[in-house]
Regions:
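C-terminal segment of classical bacterial N-terminal signal peptides
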Residues: 15-23
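Processing junctions and N-termini across compartments
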Residues: 19, 133-136
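Bacterial N-terminal signal peptides that target proteins for export
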Residues: 1-9
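Hydrophobic residues within membrane-embedded alpha helices
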Residues: 3-4, 14, 67
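Extracytoplasmic c-type cytochrome modules immediately beyond a signal peptide or single-pass transmembrane anchor
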Residues: 26-134
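The canonical Cys-X-X-Cys-His
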Residues: 135-147
Length: 148
């Protein structure tokens, strides 16, 4: 259990460092750009909550947060219509240049998040820790390719 707590602490730090831009102000964002920024910010909040809940092993609450993340991941590409890049959006043009790749990245995120849900349902902390890490990794992986 001590090893899992160390891993969990590391994951929380990684998740917090992965998406710092989400919390920055996006002055002037409106419409679908603001909606997607709000969804990304909510996702970070859900990830932080899951990390805290893992310590208390509140599996039901973990599932609720993970379901919210997955719901966003499933619809994320819909929030990136052509022409919705540019300031104040932090989205790279690569999203629209390789939209199939972007959709695949969103699906990878949804699949990783489903892993959190399944591990929490099984009350398997080892699998949950791995799924949490995988989900955080999908965030950073996508940001490296598709976010400014």
């Amino acid at each position: 259990m001590k090893k899992q707590l160390v891993i969990l602490a590391t994951l929380l730090i990684t998740a917090s460092a992965t998406v710092p831009g989400i919390l920055s102000a996006h002055d002037g964002a409106t419409g679908i750009v603001k909606e997607r920024m709000d969804n990304f910010k909510a996702t970070q909040g859900h990830l932080k909550a899951i990390g805290k809940l893992m310590r208390s092993q509140d599996y039901a609450a973990i599932i609720e947060h993970a379901e919210q993340i997955k719901a966003w991941a499933d619809k994320m590409p819909e929030y990136f219509p052509a022409g919705s890049g540019g300031a104040p959006s932090a989205a790279k043009a690569r999203i629209w240049e390789d939209f199939d790749g972007f959709k695949a990245a969103a699906q990878t995120h949804a699949t990783a998040t489903q892993g959190i849900i399944e591990a929490a349902k099984a009350e398997d902390m080892t699998a949950l820790t791995a799924a949490f890490r995988a989900t955080a990794d999908t965030c950073s992986g996508c940001h490296k390719v598709f976010k400014k």
